[in-house]
Amino acid sequence: MTYESVAQSELSPEQKVDKLVANMSDADKVRQLLMIGIHGKTLNDDAKFMLNEYRVGGIILFDRNMESKDQVKTLIADINKAGKSAGLTPLFIGIDQEGGAVARMEDQLIKVPPAEELGKAPIEQATSLAKQSGAELKDLGFNINFAPVADLGLTYGRSFSTNPDEVVRYAGAVGKAYDEAGLWYSYKHFPGIGKTDVDLHADTSIVPVSKETLLSEDTKVFIDLIKQSKPNTYTIMVSHAMYPQIDSDHPASLSKAIITDWLRKDIGYNGVVVTDDMDMGALANHYTFGDMAVQSILAGSDILLVCHEYEHMQEAYNGLMKAVKDGRISKERLDESVKRILLMKMSKIS
């Protein structure tokens, strides 16, 4: 039984996913939870090893992997070919292409201004650029863009506005444009990092405000976007910031109180939750990769981004496998995430 044969059957999407999951080993399920960065501009032996040995659920590319459109097309085609040869379910192929300060290969791809600049222009401009950029990324072989930013007033011009309603309007329009271009997209960084005071790439940042304040400001954006966006077209990316008035012990990406109790139960989001990069200092300075991977899945995350070091991805995988074997991560909890991931993949890849 292959992904393709099940995907093309007459079953409902949920039945297809149930059938796939019923025939997966624990190891194959765990691998769906990992999306990793690779090194090099070609599919070198190390990258092939990671695909064949660890059979991950997705790959994310950075400037280190990209030098020209033709080269990127070839690399992604080779990744997909290697994945298919290894018998993998189709891979998420991701990129961070927000525009402005966060843009890859910006000398050769459509130049998208910072969100702050777009937020001051007519919304049609933001929508048009997102459609053009999305179509370009799709043509290169990407299927998910980790954008748009849904935070309020973030530094480096990454936010559309400090006004929650304006961020909803612009981020929602941009997300819809990516979907129409054939890409999945991601609203980030739940529950909002506009009030952080430390770069999370460097270390932990504490957001010392109440849940009520977040609900009327930063998190209101995510709630409104979830209400208006089509299921399985997007993910919610959770931040590594700490919100001590909600959970004094864990950053958001490791917090059951924030992901399961708040985002899933209270807000009602049933889709895929992806972490921000676990190689960032906000987590990597304080946890082992095995521990953070296990804690994040127990908290309610589905996909763990490990973007830079193969060793860290291996530690995360080994930690997850140990937790599945000793029962800390139950079969039911593991299957929940895998089903969400496969249902999302099934929505665009047959």
Descriptions of predicted regions:
Residues T2-L91, Q97-R104:
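N-terminal hydrophobic targeting/anchoring segments and the immediately downstream early-domain regions
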Residues S25, E67-K84, L91, T162, ...:
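Second-shell residues forming the walls of enzyme active-site clefts
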Residues L33-L43, A115-S128, D203-E217, D279-Y287:
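Active-site mouth loops of central-metabolism enzymes
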Residues H39-K41, R64, D96-G100, V149-D151, ...:
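Active-site beta-loop-alpha junctions enriched in small/polar residues
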Residues H39-N52, Q125-E136, S216-D224, Y287-Q295:
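Short, acidic/polar
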Residues G57-F62, F142-V149, G300, L304:
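Divalent metal-dependent hydrolysis catalytic cores, especially in the metallo-beta-lactamase
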Residues N80-I110, L129-V149, G175-G192:
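Glycine-rich, aromatic-flanked loop segments that form ligand/cofactor-binding clefts
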Residues A115-A171, G175, D179:
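A substrate-binding/cap region within the structured catalytic cores of diverse enzymes
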